[in-house]
């Protein structure tokens, strides 16, 4: 449903390459409520998403930047401010659960420093970099909404072989809480969302199977996560800050997480 709740607001979203991912879903959700957009990804596909959004009538500008390139991010932030005059909303959606190699799982004893640094960089440092690039402008204007995409994996549960990802996603929550206290009196809220099993274009067969064992019997959708982010980006959430909000279909509250017919 298109409304004007975010009309006059400008949002910057990271991780907007896949047509089936949470980043693009977030961009569409914010635009539906009237926001103008900046979208960023390391992939050239970000320009495809820009084209898609423009065809929907959205005011949008795309940036192809590595989120670990601090100078590139600062340049994008400066350009966004020049084009739109301000950035009110920052949604740090980008991240991934692998080491930059073909291996998906690797125990701590077998990790090398490069693999650890890759995961920490792409999940945690990227969030720090974009936040720092846009934060001063929000402080100067005494207004801002920052939403960080963490995960249930790390802050609340863990998997063997995923220690860098778990560490990074847990650290995002710590960053969220500390920053919320630093800038709360400047009318800036900072929150994190913790998705569980979400069906995206990057989901593996095992991840999709895991989604069938949630309390709701299905994985979530990028649109469902995007609507939560949109709520936190709106003034309806004006007194919510420093929080981690779980969106996982009731998965982590279960003691037993296998097929229901084997237990109930």
Protein language model features and the residues they cover:
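A conserved structural motif in NAD(P)-dependent oxidoreductases
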Residues: 214-225, 236
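Canonical Rossmann dinucleotide-binding motif of NAD(H)/NADP(H)-dependent dehydrogenases/reductases
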Residues: 4-38
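Short C-terminal tail/terminal secondary-structure segment
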Residues: 230, 241-264
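Short, small/polar-rich loop/turn modules that mediate ligand/substrate recognition or access, typified
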Residues: 184, 189, 240-242
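Catalytic Tyr-X3-Lys loop
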Residues: 88, 96, 109-128, 143, ...
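Active-site Tyr-X3-Lys motif and surrounding loop/helix of classical short-chain dehydrogenase/reductase
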Residues: 75-82, 101-110, 114-121
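Active-site helix of classical SDR
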Residues: 131, 168, 176
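Alpha-helical segment proximal to the catalytic Tyr-Lys
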Residues: 136, 155, 181-182, 238
């Amino acid at each position: 449903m298109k409304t004007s709740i975010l009309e006059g607001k400008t949002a910057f979203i990271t991780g907007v390459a896949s047509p089936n991912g949470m980043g693009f879903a977030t961009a569409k959700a914010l635009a539906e409520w009237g926001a103008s957009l900046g979208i960023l990804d390391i992939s050239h596909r970000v320009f495809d998403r820009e084209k898609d959004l423009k065809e929907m009538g959205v005011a949008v500008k795309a940036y192809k930047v590595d989120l670990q390139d601090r100078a590139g991010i600062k340049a994008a932030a400066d350009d966004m401010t020049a084009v739109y005059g301000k950035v009110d909303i920052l949604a740090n959606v980008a991240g991934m659960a692998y080491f930059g190699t073909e291996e998906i799982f690797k125990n701590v004893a077998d990790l090398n420093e490069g693999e650890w640094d890759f995961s920490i960089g792409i999940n945690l440092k990227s969030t720090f970099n974009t936040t720092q690039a846009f934060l001063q402008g929000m402080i100067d204007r005494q207004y801002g909404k920052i939403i960080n995409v963490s995960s249930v994996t790390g802050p609340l549960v863990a998997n063997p072989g995923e220690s860098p990802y778990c560490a990074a996603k847990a650290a995002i929550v710590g960053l969220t809480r500390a920053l919320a206290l630093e800038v709360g009196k400047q009318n800036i809220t900072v929150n994190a969302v913790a998705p569980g099993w979400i069906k995206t274009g990057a989901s593996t067969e095992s991840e999709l199977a895991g989604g069938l064992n949630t309390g709701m019997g299905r994985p979530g959708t990028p649109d469902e996560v995007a609507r939560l982010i949109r709520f936190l980006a709106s003034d309806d959430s004006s007194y919510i800050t420093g929080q981690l909000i779980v969106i996982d279909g009731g998965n982590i509250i279960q003691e037993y997480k296998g097929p229901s017919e084997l237990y109930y």
